[in-house]
Amino acid sequence: MAERVARLSSQRAVVIFGASNCFMCHVVKTLFSELGVSWAVHEVDKDPNGKDVERALAGMVGRTPPVPAVFIGGKLVGPTDQVMSLHLAGKLVPLLREAGALWLRDTKYSYILPANQLINYRSIN
């Protein structure tokens, strides 16, 4: 099951393993939405093998319940407290940018691109 978690966690720049009724999962999702993060979520309570996924995550995270478990760039960042610590220290956004997970809106042209692909057209003109 650890192999499945590793595979799922590397399919997108940011993957959140959570549960549909988990408040702290909602907190992380809200933070990422406000930061403009493109993320995927895997709700373990909706997965037929969710208990096995939770056991694998508990071994990786080192606690139970193991959700939310946040992966950025395929690497385990941790649960909510570690995500928030990174955010408060100013280290979360650079990590998200490096993983290609931040989406920014170009207000002049009204489209959305990943932050690492945003072209500054104002400097060209």
From Swiss-Prot:
Keyword check for Disulfide bond: yes
Give the location in the cell: Cytoplasm
Domain named Glutaredoxin is located at 2-103
**Principal localization?**
cytoplasm
Q: Quote the SUPFAM superfamilies the UniProt record gives.
A: Thioredoxin-like
Arranged from A to Z, the UniProt key words for this protein are: Cytoplasm, Disulfide bond, Electron transport, Redox-active center, Transport
Q: Which cysteines are joined by disulfide bonds?
A: 22-25
Cross-referenced PROSITE patterns: GLUTAREDOXIN_2
Q: Which family does it belong to?
A: Belongs to the glutaredoxin family. CC-type subfamily.
Q: What does this protein do?
A: Has a glutathione-disulfide oxidoreductase activity in the presence of NADPH and glutathione reductase. Reduces low molecular weight disulfides and proteins.
Q: What is this protein called?
A: Putative glutaredoxin-C2
Q: What is the lineage of its organism?
A: Eukaryota, Viridiplantae, Streptophyta, Embryophyta, Tracheophyta
